[in-house]
Design a protein with these regions (language model features):
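A short, charge-rich alpha-helical start-of-domain segment used by transcription regulators
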Residues: 2-35, 45, 59, 64
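Σ70-family region 2.3-2.4 aromatic/basic alpha-helix that recognizes the −10 promoter
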Residues: 30, 48-101, 164, 168
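Pre-recognition alpha-helix immediately N-terminal to the DNA-recognition helix
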Residues: 21, 32, 123, 133-134
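DNA-recognition helix of helix-turn-helix
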Residues: 147-189
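Short amphipathic alpha helix immediately N-terminal
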Residues: 125-148
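Internal acidic/polar
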Residues: 88-115, 188-196
Length: 201
């Protein structure tokens, strides 16, 4: 099963992570869905209930519908995960909405950032609050626009930009090898201390 159309905007131009990058890491779309749900929710057992598996439907359909279904399954899985965390996302968005404007707009994740995210997903998950994680998936991996992400999450574009900046900053710390700094609290924003402690152990 191909991941070429997993996200409709994941197309390679040499700067951003492509569908091929995702395919090379995960192997098939089942693994992508598991990683998405687990990264967003931080609980493997809880994540299972949010995975929308299109496999049985896909077996009886043609290639074009098959490709669309893979894309849909990924989007539906993320949406289901969001519904379980909506209250927390909205609460965090109010906090992020009170900050200063982001000076430089961030691009979708690079191939290097994508690889760092996958290789260090537990550490990044512990560093980022749930809003940052959803924004990282929608804006960074799926390459949705800031406006589209804001609409899907029901928050302001400025909150999306600040949350995404935090996510990219965390990936930059990893790229620079500043792992200990990555483990420290930052900006006063909320993040999961229990997950952080587990990642240090």
């Amino acid at each position: 099963m191909t991941l070429a159309r997993l996200f409709d905007k994941l197309r390679g131009n040499g700067r951003y992570a492509t569908a091929d990058d995702i395919r090379n890491v995960f192997g098939d779309y089942h693994n992508v869905l598991h990683w998405l749900a687990d990264f967003l929710l931080g609980d493997s057992n809880f994540a299972e209930s949010c995975i929308v598996d299109a496999c049985t439907i896909a077996q009886t359909q043609g290639p074009m519908f098959h490709e669309w279904l893979v894309h849909w399954a990924a989007r539906a899985t993320v949406r289901c995960a969001f519904q379980t965390q909506q209250a927390s996302v909205l609460e965090l968005a109010r906090e992020y909405g009170q900050g200063v404007d982001v000076e430089q707009k961030q691009s979708p994740v690079s191939v290097e950032h994508f690889q760092l995210l996958i290789e260090n997903s537990d550490l990044i998950q512990a560093r980022l609050d749930v809003l940052c994680r959803f924004v990282l998936v929608y804006r960074g991996i799926a390459k949705d626009s800031t406006t589209a992400v804001a609409s899907q999450l029901g928050i302001t574009a400025s909150a999306v930009e600040r949350a995404y900046e935090n996510a990219i900053n965390a990936l930059d710390l990893l790229r620079q090898g500043a792992v200990r700094e990555l483990m420290l609290p930052h900006y006063g924003h909320i993040y999961h201390e229990s997950a952080l402690a587990a990642s240090i152990d």
